[in-house]
């Protein structure tokens, strides 16, 4: 149901029906509001957000079972009725927690992606991603559990570059073919959270759908009235640093070179002797990381 143009083409090819007529409906969920927030005070932000939606059904997605348990406990301690759901729980517990959510005995379910497949609760008003999803397909499916009754749904994702690094290390343990596919999907998800353009436009374009309005009015970027910023000087510094590093520098090494933070890796490459060493120390490492990603 969330097939990209490439996936649809592969399906037709593998089923040997390449000349078949295809029918698609719009991927646009006009009643959903999309937002991405920096992962700084994520627990505090989530509690505030859930309290703003007090009494309404919400799903909080986390990538690990441990984080699911931690967040569920945190919410309970802060007076928010919630239960965990992940594959590490026995089937009886999972069934009880799922039923409690569907019957509205609890308002919030904190879950891994194990939750939601085949679940149709029409009045979910809030979907939070504590961690960046592994792909835009997963993101679309999971946010799509909000507002199925046609009512308003809010979808908030918290993003940190450290999450990307964790997922990248996890992929490194996979077979080479899976690594390549996984990293490509992860790059698309990263592109979505970092885009300064309309999130709805980005998402629909990924699924091969043309969305003409430049401003959807229902995402943080379109409502934020972003201002233009001339980043030419910074971009040139980044490119010069990459060239000076002779392809040895990854994002963190580029950033550390610009702010003048020596590490064992940079010492090996003699980064201190580069013209770019400390050239960007007037800006934070977060500024340079974001600019590199853009």
Regions flagged by a language model, labelled:
Residues 1-176, 181-184, 209-213, 220-221:
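Helicase motor core with emphasis on the C-terminal RecA-like subdomain
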Residues 10, 45-48, 188-191, 202, ...:
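Alpha-helical scaffold segments in soluble metabolic enzymes
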Residues 101, 193, 242-246:
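Short helix-to-turn junction characteristic of helix-turn-helix DNA-binding domains
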Residues 181-182, 212-294:
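Accessory DNA-binding and partner-docking regions appended to nucleic-acid-acting proteins
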Residues 184-210, 218:
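C-terminal accessory regions
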């Amino acid at each position: 149901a969330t097939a990209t143009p490439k996936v649809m083409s592969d399906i037709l090819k593998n089923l040997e029906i390449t000349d078949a007529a295809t029918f698609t409906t719009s991927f646009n969920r006009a009643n959903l509001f999309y937002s991405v927030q920096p992962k700084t005070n994520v627990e505090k932000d989530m509690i505030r957000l859930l309290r703003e939606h007090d009494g309404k059904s919400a799903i909080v997605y986390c990538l690990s079972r441990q984080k699911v348990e931690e967040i569920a406990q945190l919410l309970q301690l802060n007076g928010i009725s919630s239960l965990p759901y992940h594959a590490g729980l026995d089937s009886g517990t999972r069934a009880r927690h799922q039923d409690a959510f569907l019957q509205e005995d609890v308002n919030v379910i904190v879950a891994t992606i194990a939750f939601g497949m085949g679940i149709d609760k029409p009045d979910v008003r809030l979907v939070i991603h504590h961690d960046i999803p592994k792909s835009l397909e997963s993101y679309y499916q999971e946010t799509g559990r909000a507002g199925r009754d046609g009512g308003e749904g809010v979808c908030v994702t918290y993003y940190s570059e450290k999450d990307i690094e964790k997922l990248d290390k996890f992929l490194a343990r996979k077979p080479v073919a899976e690594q390549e596919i996984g990293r490509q999907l992860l790059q698309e998800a990263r592109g979505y959270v970092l885009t300064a353009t309309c999130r709805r436009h980005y998402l629909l374009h990924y699924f091969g759908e043309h969305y003409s309005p430049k401003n959807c009015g229902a995402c943080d970027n379109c409502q934020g009235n972003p201002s233009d910023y001339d980043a030419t000087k910074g971009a040139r510094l980044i490119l010069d640093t990459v060239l000076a590093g002779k392809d040895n520098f990854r994002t963190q090494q580029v950033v550390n070179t610009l702010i003048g933070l020596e590490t064992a890796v940079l010492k090996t490459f003699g980064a201190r002797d580069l013209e770019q060493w400390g050239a960007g120390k007037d800006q934070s490492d977060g500024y340079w990381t974001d600019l590199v990603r853009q």
